[in-house]
Swiss-Prot record:
Residues 22-328 form the Protein kinase domain. Its EC number is 2.7.11.1. This is Serine/threonine-protein kinase atg1. Pfam families: ATG1-like_MIT1, ATG1-like_MIT2, Pkinase. It catalyses: L-seryl-[protein] + ATP = O-phospho-L-seryl-[protein] + ADP + H(+); L-threonyl-[protein] + ATP = O-phospho-L-threonyl-[protein] + ADP + H(+). It comes from the Eukaryota. ATP binds at residues 28-36, 51. SMART domains: S_TKc. InterPro entries: Atg1-like, ATG1-like_MIT2, Atg1-like_tMIT, Kinase-like_dom_sf, Prot_kinase_dom, Protein_kinase_ATP_BS, Ser/Thr_kinase_AS. GO terms for cellular component: Atg1/ULK1 kinase complex; autophagosome membrane; cytosol; phagophore; phagophore assembly site membrane; vacuole-isolation membrane contact site. It comes from Aspergillus oryzae (strain ATCC 42149 / RIB 40) (Yellow koji mold). It is found in: Cytoplasm; Preautophagosomal structure membrane.
Length: 934
């Protein structure tokens, strides 16, 4: 929002760089995979934004996927979508030339609402519609932005496209169209089409909203991962946070969160990670509260509440949203100058007619047939660009009679094809089914219902479509579906290796949570709110819908135990193991952590720096809401069932394994939290200047968080190996629970329950195991995301090291461990192993606790330190247990080499290590048992 563009990005100024017909200027933003620059058209001197994507982070298939998506996006033009104008590829980057939005994004617009009256682009808006006290933006401005957002979403919806990442940071703002006409806005942007800066709805005297970055979430999944870990899931629908299958209604939840933030000034739910966020959403039970002093109208509040329904079935649908009075009706409270005129076109006409959509895909000829290009005197670069734009206000009947060229990844239905003049519908238009994504396949019942609703919506549409011969349409549809399926399969094979493991874990947790045996006699109404019985102590069970059971572990723990909570589980510190089946999860995690994260290990030779462990206030494992009393006193008291004793042992083994994983997770969190400030989240102010910490500091010496590159690499390596260790322990917990569940399904453990003598006991055991499984599932998903974030940080850090550094990629002696491309491989420095880090830290904690006990300092934390050290040492031994339990046929040669490396660590054989560790456990356990608080 600066009027002096020569001052833009003084700290990050780069030499001008020609990119096709454009010149790249200064940097205005930075992300995890791309850098955004301001650019200018070399002849027209109009401004563009150039997004330079680093190809080194994309493997071959992802590059092909991105190219297909780009071809589709080039054919989508709408006034409220940031247009992709051009694309240039070099050996190292893909440069995406996009429309330039001078006012920045909506999030900064809201944050700096108190200073908008001082800026030349927005001072007239604030003079007419001042921001209210107790609120964020004036309701006139809120409704104006909402209308434009709905217009863009309807355009996407008619083409069966889902954005999946609607948030204020992806809603960019341009100066009002009237400011361009009056000359107030001096920076003229390059037009993607004739009506790029002519609003389809809303007011011409207010800033114009455009959706950005749609369609890239799937092609560039590293962004969603980095953003997820840095705080952007604040706007994600709960079904996505629960790792459930979802449809386009996820966008409506995001619209509700954005609308709430425009009204209140902050998101409706705030948390530091997606696990805590989901817990808060579930705890809220659809009760959306507004500050008492907030002046928002009841109509706006009601719309927000209908959009922010946890259950997508109960959420407002697209038809109702597009037809509601807030979207279709006039904006109340307008001043006389902004009163609507009869000549203004309606948003619905623009959305459904597609007059702003380029009628021909750029994959074919750049000049559409059957349509003359109209000259635009205000657009001098048009002839040189050889790009066709639709005529302004062109009615639907003037479309080209030549269908657009087909694209391999084209997502448009038959209704989106060009029509012949003045022809009407001859066949019922049908929207293609929702695209099943690699990260979230489409849920069948929602897909079917969605398709039915789409037909009804099309019948009510004002649009007219040409009839397409049935045989031709069917053949083309079959070809498109087969090509799209091939693309989906190839994409999943190359990228979503981790996701498949998460799917297995989530599938078992879903099965257990929805089983009638687990639910017992509890109500099974699909939409009724039910409360967990038997809460203990002060724990409050959260009322949730059974459909949201996949996230019920949020009720159990938020992932971080409170320092003031009491660890009530009195499990023995002796090692008890159940028979762990060799499931796909355990096998995959043990066989190749590298297969999950692209990791290869150098032979361990020397030990690098260790790290600080969790603080003494860290509680290893959260208490469950179900009663934790003795299982032996529940039932009829007549006799004890042998299978009941086995169930009790199973519960204890699962809990102890989960506890060990939680201790390792806590250790990894210490490393991870030191990397969080390094997340690529450089923000730009409304003027477009990049806020780069450190000014002109050499980025190779210090990172944004003040850590050296060496420190970043060390922390990333240690966090990564610890997260992988935590995953293996979590997978083992799931395996033990899976074996128990298999026995239950075979009837081996339900012989007595049919007679009614152990129903209460079986229900208690089942609920207790279900609680652990749900907790493990959510922790597993969280660790997967954090491990991927750390992996990317490690790759980035290693590339920034000096070329002669041993950890620089050019000096790695171990070959790639994953066949998806060298860009995804990671090699950890010699000597960095989770077992060594854990062993050193356990001894450090126990020694510190012993000293504190002798000196009488911090006695309250001594027992916690002893218990944590014991669990960490037991987790070290867990590696040997897993290694011996896995058959040799299930491992590959790379794992055999790693096992051989582990047989000798620092000159100590495996058997000797076990003796040393077990001796340490015995000593610490004895010390802990003798510890008594004064």
């Amino acid at each position: 929002m600066s009027s002096s563009h020569h001052r833009r990005s003084r700290e990050t100024s780069h030499a001008e760089m020609p990119i096709g017909r454009y010149t790249r200027l200064d940097e205005i933003g930075r992300g995890s995979f791309a850098t955004v620059y301001q650019g200018v058209h070399t002849k027209s001197r109009t401004y563009v934004a150039i997004k330079s994507v680093n190809l080194s982070k994309l493997n071959k298939k992802l590059k092909e996927n991105l190219s297909s998506e780009i071809h589709i996006l080039k054919g989508l033009y709408h006034p409220h979508i940031v247009a992709l104008i051009d694309c240039h590829e070099t050996t190292s980057h893909i440069h995406l030339v996009m429309e330039y939005c001078a006012l920045g994004d909506l999030s900064l617009f809201i944050k700096r609402r108190d200073t908008l009256g001082d800026h030349r682009y927005t001072q007239d808006m604030i003079a007419k519609y001042p921001n209210p006290r107790g609120g964020a933006l004036n309701e006139v401005v809120v409704r104006h932005f909402l209308k434009q957002l709905a217009s863009a979403l309807k355009f996407l919806r008619d083409r069966n496209l889902i954005h999946r990442d609607i948030k204020p940071q992806n809603l960019l703002l341009c100066p009002s169209p009237s400011s361009y006409r009056s000359g107030v806005a001096q920076v003229v942007p390059f037009k993607g089409c004739d009506e790029s800066f002519s609003p389809a709805t809303g007011l011409e005297s207010l800033p114009m909203l455009k959706i950005a970055d749609f369609g890239f979430a799937r092609s560039l999944p590293s962004t969603s991962l980095a953003e997820t870990l840095c705080g952007s899931p604040l706007y994600m629908a709960p079904e996505i946070l629960r790792y459930e299958k979802y449809d386009a209604k996820a966008d409506l939840w995001s619209v509700g969160t954005v609308l709430y933030e425009m009204v209140v000034g902050k998101p409706p739910f705030r948390a530091t990670n997606h696990v805590e966020l989901l817990r808060k959403i579930e705890k809220g039970e659809d009760r959306i509260k507004f500050p008492e002093e907030n002046p928002a109208s009841e109509q706006i509040k009601s719309l927000i509440r209908m959009l922010l329904k946890r259950n997508p079935v109960e959420r407002m649908n697209f038809s109702d949203f597009f037809d509601c009075d807030t979207i279709t009706g006039p904006i109340p409270g307008l001043i006389a100058d902004d009163a609507p005129s009869t000549s203004r076109r309606s948003s619905v006409a623009v959305n459904t007619s597609g007059s702003t959509s380029r009628p021909q895909s750029r994959t074919g000829s750049r000049t559409p047939t059957g349509m003359k290009r109209e000259k635009d005197a205000s657009y001098p670069g048009k002839k040189d660009d050889q790009v066709s734009y639709p005529a302004a206000h062109r009615p639907p009947t003037q479309r080209s009679d030549t269908p657009p060229a087909s694209s391999p990844m084209r997502r448009m239905g038959s209704g989106d094809r060009a029509t012949t003049s003045k022809e009407t519908v001859t066949t019922t238009p049908r929207r293609p089914s929702v695209v099943s994504l690699a990260t979230a396949p489409g849920r069948q019942e929602l897909v079917d219902r969605n398709a039915t609703a789409a037909v009804m919506e099309r019948q009510r549409s004002r649009n007219t479509y040409a009839g397409v011969p049935q045989t031709e349409k069917q053949a083309e549809k079959t070809k498109e579906e087969s090509e799209r399926a091939a693309q989906e399969i190839a994409f999943e094979r190359d990228y979503v290796l981790v996701e498949k493991r998460a799917v297995e874990v989530n599938a078992f947790a879903d099965e257990l949570a929805h089983s009638p045996r687990i639910q017992g006699g509890f109500p099974r109404n699909a939409y009724a709110l039910s409360r967990r019985p038997g809460t203990q102590g002060s724990s409050t069970a959260t009322a949730t819908s059974p459909l949201a059971t996949t996230g019920k572990a949020m009720q159990v723990a938020s992932g971080r135990a409170r320092a003031d909570s009491t660890h009530t589980r009195q499990g023995s510190y002796e090692r008890r193991y159940g028979q762990s089946p060799t499931s796909a999860i355990s096998k995959a995690l043990h066989m190749a952590s590298g297969r999950l994260f692209g990791m290869g290990f150098s032979p361990p030779m020397t030990i690098t720096k260790g790290g600080r462990s969790p603080p003494l206030g860290y509680n290893p494992f959260p208490a469950y809401p179900a009663a934790q009393g003795s299982l032996m006193v529940v039932g009829d008291g007549a006799r004890t069932n042998v299978t009941l004793d086995e169930d009790a042992k199973t519960v204890q083994v699962i809990e102890e394994c989960a506890t060990r994983s939680d201790v390792v997770y806590g250790f990894a969190e210490v490393k991870y939290k030191q990397l969080i400030p390094l997340a690529p989240s450089v923000q730009t102010d409304p003027s477009g200047r990049a806020n780069v910490p450190g000014g002109e500091r050499d980025s190779t010496d210090l990172t944004d968080g003040g850590l050296t590159v060496d420190a970043v690499v060390t922390l990333s390596e240690e966090a990564l190996v610890l997260y992988v260790k935590a995953l293996s322990l979590l997978a083992k917990s799931m395996d033990i629970a899976g074996a128990w569940w298999s026995r239950k399904n075979r009837g081996e453990a339900f012989g007595e329950s049919a007679m009614g003598r152990t129903d209460a006991t079986s229900t208690l055991v089942s609920n207790r195991i279900n609680n652990v499984v749900q907790w493990v599932r959510n922790r597993f998903n969280e660790v997967l995301e954090k491990a991927e974030f750390v992996r990317l940080k490690l790759i980035e850090g290693q590339k920034r090291l000096p070329p002669d550094h041993p950890s620089h990629p050019s000096n790695h002696s171990v070959g790639p461990s994953v066949g998806s491309g060298a860009s995804t491989d990671v090699v950890v420095s010699s000597g960095v192993t989770a077992e060594k880090l854990m062993y050193d830290r356990a001894l450090e904690m126990s020694r510190a606790a012993a000293i504190n006990e002798l000196t009488g300092e911090e006695l309250s934390g001594c027992e916690i330190a002893y218990v944590t050290a014991i669990r960490m040492l037991e987790a070290v031994l867990e590696e040997e247990e897993v290694s011996r339990s896995e058959p040799g046929s299930g491992t590959d040669r790379g794992d055999a080499r790693r096992d051989g490396d582990k047989a000798m660590l620092d000159g100590v054989r495996m058997e000797d290590r076990q003796v040393v560790i077990k001796s340490s456990i015995f000593i610490v356990t004895r010390k802990q048992s003798s510890f008594v608080l004064p």
